[in-house]
Amino acid sequence: MKPFHLVYYVSMGCPSIEYSLQKAELYLANGVKAIQFDLPSRNPYRENPPIRERMARAWDACSDYEEYFRALSDFRRKHPDFEMQMVSYEDVILTVGTLRYIRFCQENQIKTCRISGSSSFEIARKDMNAAGIDTLTFIDYDMKEEEIAFALETGRAVMLRNKRRGMLSRDGMTEWDERIRFLRDRGIQQPIYATAEMKCGRDILEARQAGADGAFVGSCLMALWEDDQKLVELIHELAEAGERPI
């Protein structure tokens, strides 16, 4: 069985770029092996309210993406051995330019990105793929047919969203095991990552037992950024759940 791929999401720039990277250093010091950083978007429509608020505050504090690139590149030079990922929205890529974004990824050994945007933005993702950068695709809680078809067409790893307030499940499928089984039966063979509302070790175990290949964890940890002791305890709880034999 392949190791469960646990990726920790760090929202950049709130309250400052430096503060976000201090917390990322704490993650690495406590055994984290993969971190996904974002760049603040003016329309982070896929994020939950706390992340939207963080991005808005980060944008107000610093809207110069080159500042983020420089800080992240410095962080990468200090920590060359962890898996570094990125998540960016369409407006971010349009602002910095696809070629500049690709160059940043290549310079920092970033092999995986989540690029959120309209279907017309697919050309940017294909440019990244051609440059050796994998892009994740997204299937929301209601598992729309067009999202499944797109995942089948591209063969990209899937981020499968957990429950979303105000959104109905597809055909009453609410649990990880029935939703992942449904996607596998539809022909999705690529890795499936559980995301959203992953708050504790039990949530990680449920996703693992349902057949998820990995998970993205973010908001539950960022909510503890003012309490390092509780933050470290939760990091270890999540890691243990990701490694425990099942």
Model-flagged regions — what are they?
Residues 1-80, 148, 152-154, 229:
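Conserved N-terminal beta1-alpha1 strand-loop-helix module at the mouth
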Residues 6-10, 35-37, 84-88, 113-115, ...:
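Hydrophobic faces of well-ordered beta-strands that scaffold small-molecule active sites
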Residues 17-29, 99-100, 143-154, 194, ...:
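Catalytic cores of alpha/beta
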Residues 33-44, 108-121, 159-168, 210-231:
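Glycine-rich phosphate-binding active-site loops on the catalytic face of alpha/beta enzymes
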Residues 46-57, 219-246:
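C-terminal helical cap(s) of enzyme catalytic domains, especially alpha/beta-barrels
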Residues 97-140:
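Hydrophobic, well-structured mid-protein blocks that either form specific transmembrane helices
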Residues 97-102, 172-180, 231-234:
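Charged helix-capping and loop-helix junction motifs
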Residues 148-182, 224:
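Glycine/Thr-rich beta-alpha phosphate-binding loop at enzyme active sites
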